[in-house]
Amino acid sequence: MVAIQQNLKSEDRRIDVNSIFSLDRIGNSSTVESGQSLTIGTEYLKSRKINNEEENEYPTDVLELSLATVFRDEINESMPTTSSLGSKSSDVVGHIGLSPNNFFSSNYNFSLDNNLDVLKYNSLDAKFTVNNFITSFKYLEENDNIGDENYIENNTSFKFNENSSIGFSVRKNKKIDLTEFYDLIYQYKNDCLTAAIKYKKDFYVDGDLKPTEQLFFSLTIVPLGAFESANVIPK
């Protein structure tokens, strides 16, 4: 039995082009949307024709463009504020995906208000792959009812061989112009064992600008289980 709609106003339910057409787009299986709404969207997809020899070398979809929005006959104040689904005209959400070759790919997701003059959500990520070297960047900006996060992040990894790799992650908070953290990990992995050395540095936690550092070791043996050491850097 499905209950009548609950008050979900305070729930965090940002919509995008993937979720806006879902029957469970409000993210609560115990309730349904009340009232009437119309969801419309458009999609453009450019694909590459490839032969069997190229099947694993190049991405099939080169360019993706998507736009969608929701119209409602009456305002529904019980809908999540971050989703804008309770308004007569919701935000316009969109996606642009670009994969011209097997070295580079990029995705851009955004939300514009219904007047198309306020960019509420702005997320851009790009990935570069050259042999065993992979680096990716992500930029996120939230405004208005969606949130207030704003950061840029990088994740980089390099595989020395089939078993050994090193990875690095760093994030900078653009709102306060401070680096949040950086992580460094060296990992060895085979069929039955994974061993890693991890270094983590947080530059601030919950408003405290005092940096914290951690260095620890982890070991996983199949099927015996996993072990992780305590922080070996004195506080």
Regions found by a protein language model. Give the residues of each.
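Outer-membrane beta-barrel translocator/pore domains, especially the C-terminal barrels
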Residues: M1-K235
